[in-house]
Amino acid sequence: MLKHILLVSLLSFSTLPLLKAQSCGNDEKYHLPYKNTYVKEPLVTENEYRVAKPETIVPKSFEEARQILPNPIWGGHDKELEMYWKAWEIAIGNIRAPQAGSGFVSSYLDTAYNGNIFMWDSSFILMFARYGTRFFPFQNTLNNFYAKQHPDGFICREIKADGADCFERYDPVSTGPNLMPWCEMVYFHQFGDTERLHKIFPVLCAYYKWLKLNHTWRNGTYWSSGWGTGMDNMPRVPSEYSPIYSHGHMIWLDTNL
């Protein structure tokens, strides 16, 4: 009788549909063998960017931009002014539209050398690009990171143009440092965009909670790695550790800031 019950149970189980792990953006591209280990963060359900439709904005020409962008007046400094306008010309030339199927939701400023978007580079360049907001909504560059947030709050620091994360989330180089709130606060202080603040708040809170859970030591300080901080050319770990890939069992000051 017991054998019969077990046999029926096994046959019934085999007819059930297989549960597919929630995608993290890489599954179909790289056929990752990982099991679903997500502990879902409720704040992620408030992330509107994960379900937003892509919005492509085609920028105007650089000649048109010169009529809109801040026009500095600095007598006797023609070379400096030439550099200023050249910086804007380069920036405008690097505006990209989201690829179809990438999961990106906004046209963005591409700051990298390889076609990927970088959390570190994007956050800092937007502190400059915000002065061109009347010409183009550069701040929306960060929307693409928010759109690729994982169910547990993680956001990869480097994402390919096709939307695929470059690193598994528990890799020591996978994310950080947490510069996006700083970038958003600078933007808010200048423009007072409360609507954007309300939208990004749960996203950034969920990411902060993930970092606090997964990138801190027992005393509450944070760790990172050379690539994780964007400072792989500033070796600081003991010689037995990789200056690029390892946390070196150290407290990383720039990650704690």
PLM features: residue spans?
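Bacterial Sec-dependent N-terminal signal peptides
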Residues: 1-22
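Active-site acid/base region of carbohydrate-active enzymes
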Residues: 68-89, 132, 145, 150-154, ...
